[in-house]
């Protein structure tokens, strides 16, 4: 089981134009700061957040309880000119978990409802013995094939097209994909195996000419899984395996303590 939290800014659209449209550069900076905050605060508890649309953020929150969510929510209220609502859900697959969380949030009204404010609710149950499976995917030799040959915008366009194709293919497995910078994608993928990724990469290669590879990590938390996925991808990059997909799994009972994140306000 994977636990997903959907975070949504309350009544954000109307706020951006009240009493007059706000400066776009200020709004972009504010949205980026919120995403940074979400990763620092959930990350301090071994979670991981993805910006999606910036006013809606999806986080993997295995091991993070309701009280911690409430403290994060209060921290945002104290330091931002708006509030956020959160809904939490667990399921066998990432897509199903975010679907349940989204539906729970929608029960309280529209995202632009003036009355709906600081919702915090659980769709089903908190995960106690679940796991997180993440795939860290990147494009083979993007520097040699795109960055050093094409314009910055054309390279960006190729990466975004690859992202869209990857997201569409992942959804067929009830998984999700998120762009995390450069030519990298982080994919919550509970329930998928190496063969699934190989077939998916072959389809993308045939349709776009883009070659992909992936390290897959399985752990108790998003932090554990992402660290293992990063290591798996590095093994491929360094030529230590001929595999296109390399999986690592956290040993049973293995836990790693993280240094306290002093940048986290809670």
Swiss-Prot record:
It catalyses: GTP + 3 H2O = 2-amino-5-formylamino-6-(5-phospho-D-ribosylamino)pyrimidin-4(3H)-one + 2 phosphate + 2 H(+). It comes from the Archaea. GO terms for molecular function: GTP binding; GTP cyclohydrolase IIa activity. It is an enzyme of class 3 (hydrolase). Its EC number is 3.5.4.29. Keywords: GTP-binding, Hydrolase, Nucleotide-binding. It holds the Pfam family GCH_III. GO terms for biological process: biosynthetic process. Signal peptide: none annotated. Belongs to the archaeal-type GTP cyclohydrolase family. Catalyzes the formation of 2-amino-5-formylamino-6-ribofuranosylamino-4(3H)-pyrimidinone ribonucleotide monophosphate and inorganic phosphate from GTP. Also has an independent pyrophosphate phosphohydrolase activity. This is GTP cyclohydrolase III. It comes from Methanococcus vannielii (strain ATCC 35089 / DSM 1224 / JCM 13029 / OCM 148 / SB). The gene is gch3.
């Amino acid at each position: 089981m994977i636990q997903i939290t959907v975070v949504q800014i309350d009544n954000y659209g109307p706020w951006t134009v009240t009493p007059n449209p706000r400066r776009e550069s200020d709004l972009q900076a504010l949205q980026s700061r919120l995403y940074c905050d979400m990763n620092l605060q959930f990350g301090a508890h071994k979670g991981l957040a993805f910006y999606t649309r910036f006013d809606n953020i999806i986080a993997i929150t295995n091991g993070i309880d309701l009280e911690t969510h409430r403290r994060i929510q209060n921290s945002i209220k104290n330091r931002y000119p708006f509030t956020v609502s959160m809904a939490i859900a667990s399921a066998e697959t990432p897509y199903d978990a975010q679907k349940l969380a989204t539906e729970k949030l929608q029960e309280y009204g529209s995202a632009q409802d003036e009355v709906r404010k600081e919702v915090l609710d659980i769709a089903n149950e908190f995960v106690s013995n679940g796991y997180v499976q993440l795939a860290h995917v990147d494009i083979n030799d993007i520097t040699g094939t795109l960055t050093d040959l094409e314009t910055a915008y054309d390279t960006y366009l190729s990466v975004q097209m690859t992202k869209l194709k990857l997201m569409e293919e992942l959804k067929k497995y009830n998984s999700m994909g998120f762009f995390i910078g450069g030519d990298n994608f982080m994919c919550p993928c509970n329930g998928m195996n190496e063969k699934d990724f190989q077939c998916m990469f072959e389809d993308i290669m045939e349709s776009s000419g883009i070659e992909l590879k992936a390290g897959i990590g399985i752990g108790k938390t998003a932090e554990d899984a992402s660290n293992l996925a990063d290591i798996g991808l590095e093994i491929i990059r360094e030529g230590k395996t001929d595999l296109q997909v390399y999986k690592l799994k956290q040993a049973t009972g293995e836990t790693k303590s993280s240094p306290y994140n002093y940048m986290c306000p809670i």
